[in-house]
Design a protein with these regions (language model features):
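Structural beta-strand segments of beta-rich domains
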Residues: 47-51
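Short beta-strand and strand-turn-strand segments in soluble, beta-rich domains
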Residues: 31, 70-83
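Short beta-strand segments of immunoglobulin-like
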Residues: 37-43, 83-84
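Short glycine/proline/serine/threonine-rich loop/turn segments at secondary-structure transition edges
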Residues: 102-113
Length: 139
């Protein structure tokens, strides 16, 4: 009976050690998220600009996505498209287009706070996120 218990305990310890070794063996991806083109400080009503973000990785990612984010959704500056997404790759150029919809004069500071949030997902559940913020004035 004690041999059986001892062998079960030994097997559990071995499983725990092997899990640690296998986890430590997987190198972390080196991910670079770079803003290539942002929004101007001032836009006129009706103007559109595209934010471009480059993603580069030394390992293949499962997906990369860029999404617009607003403090005042639907006012001042709005997204023309809902974002951009690419599948499995090691690099990507993500684009989000914005349009100046209305004046920001009545908003706090006279600007519309707008952001682009980029996420890169890897196998195993690792996610790398970067946020690029802009304050755009629309006279």
């Amino acid at each position: 009976m004690s041999k059986r218990i001892l062998s079960c305990v030994g097997l559990m310890v071995l499983m725990a050690l092997m899990t640690g070794v296998l986890t430590a063996a997987a190198p972390m991806a080196v991910t670079t998220i770079t803003l290539e083109q942002g929004l101007p400080a001032t836009m006129k009503v009706g103007e559109t600009y595209t934010v471009m973000v480059r993603v580069a990785s030394d390992q293949k990612f499962t997906s990369a996505q860029a999404m617009p984010d607003f403090q005042y959704a639907g006012k001042g500056v709005v997204a023309v498209n809902g974002g951009d997404r690419v599948g499995r790759n090691t690099s990507a150029l993500l684009k989000v287009t914005f349009k100046a919809k209305s004046s920001t004069a009545k908003m706090p500071g006279g600007v519309a706070p707008v952001a682009v949030v980029v996420g890169v997902r890897y196998g195993g559940g690792t996610v790398v996120v970067q946020r690029f913020e802009f304050n755009v004035r629309v006279p």
